Amino acid sequence: MSSSAGNQVRASHILIKHQGSRRKASWKDPEGQIIRNTTRDSAVSQLKALRDDILSGKAKFDDLAARYSDCSSAKRGGDLGPFGRNQMQKPFEEATFALKVGEMSDIVDTDSGVHIIKRTG
């Protein structure tokens, strides 16, 4: 049985972890030195600047994800692959399912940190 289009999405994201993140380490900061010293406000400011660069055409989403995201998906340009309901944290899932393909979210907060999400499928 194939899943209908409404049950699965595909997305890429850029995650910036901060002091309030559940896990204060990442592939690019294994000891969490930077993350422990990053406030949520500064993480949001960084993400907003990246989002502005993408929207203005100055940079590509996948290039910025590869460079700045604290998620290991950075190695794939932020691509998380396809996922369905109840597979991601609720705020992340709701934001992704609300986007149209090709659209990018505003800032989304989860226990992992702050994200911008681009729905790709």
Curated annotation (Swiss-Prot):
**What EC number(s) does the entry state?**
5.2.1.8
Question: Which ranges carry the PpiC domain?
Answer: 6-121
Keyword Magnesium in record: no
| Polar residues: compositionally biased ranges | 1-10
Reply yes or no: does the keyword rRNA-binding apply.
Answer: no
- Any GO CC annotation of this UniProt entry: cytosol
Bias-annotated ranges (Basic residues): 15-25
Please name the PROSITE patterns in this protein's record.
PPIC_PPIASE_1 (PS01096), PPIC_PPIASE_2 (PS50198)
What is known about regulation of its activity?
A: Inhibited in vitro by juglone.
InterPro entries assigned to the protein according to its UniProt record, in alphabetical order: PPIase_dom_sf, PPIase_Pin1, PPIase_PpiC, PPIase_PpiC_CS
Task: Give the keywords, sorted.
Answer: Isomerase, Rotamase
Top-level taxon in the UniProt lineage: Eukaryota
Q: Which reaction does it catalyse?
A: [protein]-peptidylproline (omega=180) = [protein]-peptidylproline (omega=0)
Query: Per its UniProt record, what Pfam families does this chain match?
Result: Rotamase
For region Disordered, the annotated ranges are 1-32
Q: Example GO molecular function term?
A: peptidyl-prolyl cis-trans isomerase activity
Signal sequence residues? none
Stated family: Belongs to the PpiC/parvulin rotamase family.
State the protein's purpose: Prolyl cis/trans isomerase with specificity for phospho-Ser-Pro bonds.
Q: What else is known?
A: Like all plant Pin1-type PPIases, do not contain the N-terminal WW domain found in other eukaryotic parvulins, but contains a four-amino acid insertion next to the phospho-specific recognition site of the active site. These extra amino acids may be important for mediating the substrate interaction of plant enzymes.
Q: Which protein, by its recorded name, is this?
A: Peptidyl-prolyl cis-trans isomerase Pin1
Species of origin: Malus domestica (Apple)
